[in-house]
Amino acid sequence: MSLMSETMQSQPEQLRGMLADTTGVDAAAERLRGRSLFLVGTGTSWHAANIGAWFLRAAGVEAWPVQAMDAVLYGPRPAGGEGLILLSHKGTKTYTTQLLERARAEGVPTAVISGQGAPGAEIETSVVERSAAYTASHTGAMLRLAQLATALGADLGPLNGVPDAVAEVVEGPAVGVVPPRRAMEFVGAGPNQWTAAEGALKVRETAYVASAGMGVEQFLHGPSVAVGTDDTLICLDGGGPGGERLAQVARSAGSAGVPVRMIAGDAPNELLSVFPLTAAVQRIALETAETLGTNPDSFGRDVPARASALDGIAL
């Protein structure tokens, strides 16, 4: 069994632990209350930052997701009257580290959401992962963001149902998406456009399959033209107002011979649907890697020349 598979199976229990132990959440909420907030991350943490912005806007917070590199090199970045929520699996990435140092030096209040024992963590998520394909730390970061938004006044629904919703997916039958001959496309509406982006990232880094993930309207206006019978379109339905548009796009693609899978998130509302749908795209990535015989844990370092190429870049 891969490390990714083991970690995915551990998610429900780790999420229950986070619901039981909210250390740091209330204190962070008080530091950030009444401020415009920047949510910053890289890779999977960038997807969490965008979903977190949806949660925080439900609390009436002005929330701005920004890529870590962009914040450091270009801006915008938080100033004195604003706050920073920084997301990092291990607290070691180049630009998130630089941004955190700068923010603290300038007196910007922060909430650092990271793995257990990670440098600078103010709100801890999961046990630090051994697989390069981050899963539990992502669902954990989303739960911490939901808790933070709730502490700031958001009514997101019953967070105590999140672990069981994730368990139903990771412990259930295979999702069963057959690897396409060419590309795997993920689309979603509302917050689940970022679940779609996470699905594409996971499929690429675990199974080495060409993939893209985006909002359903963005997909329709251009990218959909390139999708054909050698591809697979995966539609992530969170049950919100964009669901009808998602169904229209799915029907249109299917009528052109594109293999289409519609996956619904079993949750009380669209915002909480990101949890079971994230678990679903994790399973799709893992199942694709297992079918194709790739190593989902290695970040491609077992591919000839890839390890030495990556060693020349500071992540």
What are these regions (language model features)?
Residues 24, 32-172, 189, 224-267, ...:
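Glycine-rich phosphate-binding loops that contact phosphosugars or nucleotide phosphates
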Residues 212-217:
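A structural supersecondary motif
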Residues 1-4, 47-51, 198, 278-283:
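Conserved phosphate/anionic-ligand binding catalytic regions in large, soluble enzymes, centered on
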Residues 251-315:
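Phosphate-moiety recognition in structured ligand-binding domains
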Residues 173-198:
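Internal active-site segments that recognize and position negatively charged phosphoryl groups
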Residues 1-35, 168:
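An N-terminal, well-structured beta->alpha segment
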Residues 206:
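Active-site diphosphate/adenylate-binding microenvironment
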